[in-house]
Curated annotation (Swiss-Prot):
Catalytic class of the enzyme: transferase
Name under which the protein is recorded: 6,7-dimethyl-8-ribityllumazine synthase
Name of the coding gene: ribH
Protein function: Catalyzes the formation of 6,7-dimethyl-8-ribityllumazine by condensation of 5-amino-6-(D-ribitylamino)uracil with 3,4-dihydroxy-2-butanone 4-phosphate. This is the penultimate step in the biosynthesis of riboflavin.
GO terms for cellular component: riboflavin synthase complex
Gene3D superfamilies documented for this protein: Lumazine/riboflavin synthase
Pfam families: DMRL_synthase
Length: 150
């Protein structure tokens, strides 16, 4: 069974709480166990706790959830881009999948609410698939013919 952790932003709570609910439902549907749900103040804060989560033996992958709503400035772009960059860095460094379920930048509140289910489900599905494929790849042995991992 794949064990995932979820890190969810509290900012734009009306959106992110729905995302968390959909993510938990989808993880159960896929047969994954959610070992941790960690709340952080905002999307920009997500990378702060990722290293601690990926270091845990009972975490095979991490799902990040958040919503960066467009404002009058380009602040949403800075927040979303920097968080995404750091999330990917930590995933590559740790060797554990960390998926991006972050709505934005450039989304208004209505668009964010419309994307809740899609972003949450896709992030969970990607985490589960990557964790399973990573395990399969570790156990795979080349024996003269192409090894397909899907």
């Amino acid at each position: 069974m794949v064990r995932i952790a979820v890190v969810v932003s509290e900012f734009n709570y009306d959106v992110t709480q729905l995302m968390l609910q959909k993510a938990l439902e989808h993880a159960k549907f896929l047969g994954a166990e959610v070992t941790y749900v960690v709340k952080v103040p905002g999307v920009y804060d997500i990378p702060t706790l990722l290293r601690d989560l990926v270091a845990k033996e009972e975490v095979d992958a991490v799902v990040t959830l958040g919503a960066v709503i467009q404002g009058a400035t380009k602040h949403d772009e800075v927040v979303a881009h920097q968080a995404a960059r750091k999330i990917l860095d930590i995933s590559v460094e740790s060797g554990k999948p960390i998926t991006l379920g972050i709505i934005g930048p450039g989304a208004n509140r209505m668009q964010a609410l419309e994307r809740v289910e899609e972003y949450a489900k896709r992030a969970v599905e990607a985490a589960v698939k990557l964790a399973r494929r990573k395990k399969t790849l570790r156990e795979a042995k080349y024996a003269g013919s192409t090894v397909f991992i899907d």
